[in-house]
């Protein structure tokens, strides 16, 4: 579960894979960019990738997008492969009727967890309860 939470930050506002986001779904994943090796060393050729799953809260689908020798000047996984992942995942979630994430509940729970953590920092001796928070 902790790894899934970390992978979800990749598609967050500051993440390298934010282009992989799918509207109304939490997405988690990892971008990848690698240079191709040749007999003479590393060439100016690349492989861009994005591997991810959705919904991150209850994974139903996983996909990996690999772009061999991307053209157009961009070669980073977050810029080349992540948008393709988003398009494919959005269509697959729709076709399989996977319900969107309940964002209202998600944000309420996140707020409760943060409030509990802050309260425990201030007074660690007091029992703090936040219903529904681990």
Segments predicted by a language model, with ranges:
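Short, gly/Ser/Thr-rich active-site loops of penicillin-recognizing serine hydrolases
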Residues: 82-134
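Active-site beta-strand/loop architecture of penicillin-binding DD-peptidases
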Residues: 4-97
């Amino acid at each position: 579960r902790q790894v899934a939470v970390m992978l979800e930050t990749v598609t967050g506002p500051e993440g390298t894979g934010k282009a992989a986001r799918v509207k109304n779904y939490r997405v988690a994943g990892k971008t990848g960019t690698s240079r191709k090796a040749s007999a003479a060393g590393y060439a100016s050729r690349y492989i861009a990738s994005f591997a991810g799953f959705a919904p991150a809260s209850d994974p139903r689908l996983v996909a990996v997008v690999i772009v061999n020798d991307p053209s157009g000047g961009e070669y980073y996984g977050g810029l080349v492969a992540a948008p393709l992942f988003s398009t494919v995942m959005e269509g697959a979630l729709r076709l399989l009727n996977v319900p969107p994430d309940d964002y209202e509940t998600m944000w309420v729970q996140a707020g409760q967890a943060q409030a509990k953590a802050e309260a425990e920092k201030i007074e660690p001796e007091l029992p703090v309860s936040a219903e529904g928070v681990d």
